[in-house]
UniProtKB/Swiss-Prot annotation:
Gene name, Swiss-Prot/TrEMBL: fliY
Function of the protein: Component of the flagellar switch. Binds CheY-P and increases its hydrolysis rate in vitro. May function constitutively to remove CheY-P around the flagellar switch to maintain an optimal level of CheY-P whereas CheC may function after addition of an attractant to cope with increased levels of CheY-P.
Cellular compartment(s): Cell membrane
Gene Ontology BP, a term: chemotaxis
Organism: Bacillus subtilis (strain 168)
Topology with respect to the bilayer: Peripheral membrane protein
Top EC class for this record: hydrolase
Similarity comment: family membership: Belongs to the FliN/MopA/SpaO family.
Descriptive protein name: Flagellar motor switch phosphatase FliY
Chain residue ranges for the region called Disordered: 225-271
Amino acid sequence: MENNRLSQDEIDALLNGTGSTLDEPEIPEVDDLSEMERDAIGEIGNISFGSSATALSTLLNQKVDITTPSVTVIPRSKISDAFPEPYVAIEVNYTEGFSGSNLLVVEQSDAAIIADLMIGGDGKGADPSLGEIHLSAVQEAMNQMMGSAATSMSTVFSKKIDISPPRVELLDVTEEKGTDRIPDDEMLVKVSFNLKVGELIDSSIMQLYPLTFAKDLISSLMNSESAEEEETVQPEVTYEQPKEPVTPEPRIEPKQQQQPPKRQGTAKKAAPVQVSPVEFSAFDPNEAVQAPIHNLDMLLDIPLSITVELGRTKRSVKEILELSAGSIIELDKLAGEPVDILVNQRIVAKGEVVVIEENFGVRVTDILSQAERINNLK
């Protein structure tokens, strides 16, 4: 700068600087998720997709890991940057428990490997171009995955959650193919998971749903946790209150009631009648109670076989002989219907299938009455 005047180079530098700053703020500030809300969404996805990985592993006969969720909020106008390659989109609508939908997105090459494994192939050299048979196989795999996820979400939110059969379509944002499946909301939440299938796939699988639906999930999660805390606190208060008045009063009153009749009986014969036998009668019931307890302890160590029956079906010999890897057997129970819990091959209860870490489990929902158990023995 000379004589308080800017040189041409300085003017150009200022113009270039202002131009670059004007190009940056393209996305306006909008409602976003806090760090705690992102963690909540990630935890929901972690639990639900943990069970989905188990279901997919059973279908593909491969080790499946779905881990490390990453939560981001993206505007719909930038969806092409988030999905630059051809994908396969699976649309899932909630029919009970929640009102909304989400989009499950996998790379087209990964979907081709999954489809090849589903129809009995080895997954190697799978053709990325998906036909109707391959799309149907992917749809069935995603149906099993999302069904398991809905069951896990029912456990997390303490209410029944059900979904409609998923719809599969090719998604290519650059060519505007399948974009009608993307939610119309301006702001979308993308939850990305690492997907590993044996030695064949090491990629990612993504969930996409509206920001408003994510807020509903978080709100329901917080409400279910607060309700559980209230349920655990209330029984403690009601249980402690009767202990204080009940324990001292009955012990004092019977002694006062027993003494007057004994004194009336001793008015004529005070010497021969004494209360000493009462002390021996107090010890006799205790000894009688302890004996069966020891006998019961011996029975409590007997192991019993517990079986959970998912369902049954009948097939002809021809159909059995035609079974191969990837075949699907339809059972006589509907999805979400309680399963039977058997002890030594006898039904004693009903429950819901849950996933505990990497293992299946059953939450008991109904215990059969004694009359029902007797009827099952006939």
